[in-house]
Regions:
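N-terminal amphipathic/basic-hydrophobic helices that include classical n-h-c signal peptides
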Residues: 1-22
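Long, non-globular segments of proteins
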Residues: 15, 21-210
Length: 210
């Protein structure tokens, strides 16, 4: 009975084809999907930080640097499924990412960050122009001191890797195309020789001019 109930809810939220896809991959979707969907009844993110379920081992899931999801090296092409999974990602103190539900957790292999910024827009918020970023799973993040931007420079290649905080300790890699657009809009700080953008009154550095 619980399996039928779970299937009906999954069918409504993520589609029968998505459900059958994971069923064919031998993942325990009944508990996984039902746990996620129950936690999302009020359109809120599940409280993954409160859950401490046992680890479900030997599940090969990966998020590539470009944000694409894989299961056993096969791409997960169902957008609704990926969006659903993205709501229960947790980054633990052991340095690993997990998909977490009340009944089980699955370790994720993440090549860089679990999210990727694909586009941005500028809007006036409280009388100030701010940058709004959109992730590959359609999260909207307003650049601010609460959701800051930072840039890491590779010591060998000197290539920048820009990130923005999405929620808690989960960051998104800003795609190269978006970063180049930000650089074009940035203003040079003559004192620090850094390129800066202003979002809602908060200033963020994109790096020094070489």
């Amino acid at each position: 009975q619980s399996k039928d109930y779970s299937f009906e809810k999954i069918q409504y939220k993520v589609g029968r084809r998505a459900y059958n896809y994971l069923m064919s991959k031998e993942i325990n979707t009944t508990s996984l999907f039902q746990s996620i969907l129950e936690a999302q009844k009020n359109n809120e993110l599940p409280p993954v930080e409160k859950w401490n379920p046992p680890l479900c081992e030997n599940v090969d899931m990966k998020i590539a640097r470009d944000g694409k999801w894989f299961f056993k090296n096969s791409p997960i092409g169902r957008e609704k499924m990926v969006k659903l999974f993205s709501t229960v990602i947790r980054f633990d103190d052991d340095g690993f990412y997990y998909l977490v539900t009340p009944v089980e957790k699955i370790q994720l292999k993440v090549e860089d960050k679990p999210f990727v910024i694909k586009t941005f827009n500028k809007e006036v918020i409280d009388g100030k122009e701010a940058y709004l970023f959109q992730t590959n799973v359609d999260d909207i993040v307003t650049l601010s001191n609460e959701n800051p931007l930072r840039v890491e420079i590779d010591k060998k290649t000197q290539e920048p890797s820009p990130y923005i905080l999405v929620r808690k300790n989960l960051e998104a890699l800003i795609s190269r195309n978006v970063f180049y657009q930000l650089v074009e809009e940035a203003k040079l700080n003559s004192k620090t020789q850094e390129l800066e953008i202003n979002s809602g009154g908060d200033v963020f550095s994109l790096g020094k001019v070489i």
